[in-house]
Amino acid sequence: MKKPTHIAALVPYRIYPAKMGGQKGIALFYRYLSELVPVTMITTCNNDSPEGMNANFLPVLSNSKSRYVNPFLFFSLRKIIRQNNCTHLILEHPYYGWLGILLKLFCKIELVIHSHNIEALRFKSTGKWWWKILLGYERFVHRKAGINFFITDEDRDFALKHFSLAPARCHTITYGSELSQAPPIPEKENAAKVLKDIHHIANDEKILLFNGTLDYLPNQQALDVILNELTPALLGNPSLKYKIIICGKGLPDSYDELKAYASKNIIYAGFVNDIDIYFKGADLFINPVIEGGGIKTKVVEALGHGLTVVSTQSGAIGVPPAITGNKLVSVPDGDWQGFANAIATADTASGIPDAFFGHFYWGNIAQKVKRIIS
């Protein structure tokens, strides 16, 4: 007789409180999945207790970097898996692959690798010399897993080709949106009024938004593009009235809170506790990101709020154009004049199609995962 499904999830770093896109992606994945199947989450001891999640939460891992190579974890995790009668082990990222393979062998458990990007390619894009070593390890781990989840179709296609995986074992499980429909127009109009009052923006000025962790190199490079490429191009269009709001923590001190750009329509808001009001109140989200790999979580969040997005082609990976209507404008990487032109002409009035939420709503994503593992 087949045992009832029970998932053990190994999350090797802090995700609670979930503030950044990657943290939200894992936290929301398990919040919605734990509504459908039992989940035991094993994570580091520096996590806060999550709210609104049905999972059995076990913050038992050390915060030390050596935790990734600690052989004694095998015994403690084997005990947890056996005590909870777990049938599946989901590893967030491939780094604990060695441990997952051992647990698969000794606990007779289905091993699932939940990839958030091709890690080796992400490190290659940031200039790490050892990326090929990591690529070989990723390939080895994914080949040992019974089920592989990839964040985009592009990542799945890469893995099928370069890791020689069986297609039936590989599935695209995207980052999602908590919203099952866009916020109503009055709610968006009220949010816009609040933002204009807070940041002293004129009523006839459009609000352009960029959000991201600003000490993360791909986001910092995108900020440099906004300051040095897009701003001169936009200022050269006298018919465009706008302000760009920059949100996010970690801005290096060398940028001096962007004070030198205050006269050039740049507003630095820093880290904001309620990013939703910015997604609701902005007219346009700009995403001039060309590095980093994986799906850009901020693009999904912006579209989920009914916000028009102008993005590089690299920054739009993982978002099918067929389900976004006129809300996602994709510009070739490096064509910054074309990007500025797209900002000036973007359709901000049309709505986001229902098909977007059919694909990206977290509830639907969790149902897909349940069907795969059951």
Predicted regions and their residues:
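Acidic donor-binding loop of glycosyltransferase active sites
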Residues: 146, 280-294, 307
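N-terminal subdomain of nucleotide-sugar transferases
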Residues: 1-48, 84, 237
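A charged, aromatic-enriched C-terminal amphipathic alpha-helix characteristic of glycosyltransferases
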Residues: 348-374
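Active-site proximal beta-strand in glycosyltransferases
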Residues: 7, 104-123
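Short hydrophobic beta-strand element within catalytic cores of glycosyltransferases
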Residues: 298-301, 308-313
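Conserved catalytic-core segment of nucleotide-activated headgroup transferases in glycan assembly
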Residues: 25-31, 177-257, 268, 272-273, ...
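Membrane-proximal helix-turn-helix segments that form the acceptor-binding/catalytic region
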Residues: 75-79, 105, 129-151
